[in-house]
């Protein structure tokens, strides 16, 4: 699941945020 999430985020950062709003910390770490 982690890999799938990573790929999704890479394809659409915005979509990832909306898809997984429960883990905003992870997204911020990746953005950094």
From Swiss-Prot:
Glycosylated. Coiled coil: none annotated. InterPro entries: Pentraxin-related. PROSITE patterns: PTX_2 (PS51828). The lineage of its organism: Eukaryota, Metazoa, Chordata, Craniata, Vertebrata. Residues 2-32 form the Pentraxin (PTX) domain. This is C-reactive protein. GO terms for biological process: acute-phase response. One of its GO terms (cellular component) is extracellular region. Belongs to the pentraxin family. Its main location: secreted. The keyword Iron does not apply. Homopentamer. Pentraxin (or pentaxin) have a discoid arrangement of 5 non-covalently bound subunits. The keyword Calcium applies. It is found in: Secreted. Keywords: Acute phase, Calcium, Secreted. Displays several functions associated with host defense: it promotes agglutination, bacterial capsular swelling, phagocytosis, and complement fixation through its calcium-dependent binding to phosphorylcholine.
């Amino acid at each position: 699941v982690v890999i799938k999430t990573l790929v999704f985020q890479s394809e659409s950062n915005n979509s990832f945020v909306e898809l997984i709003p429960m883990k905003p910390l992870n997204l911020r770490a990746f953005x950094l």
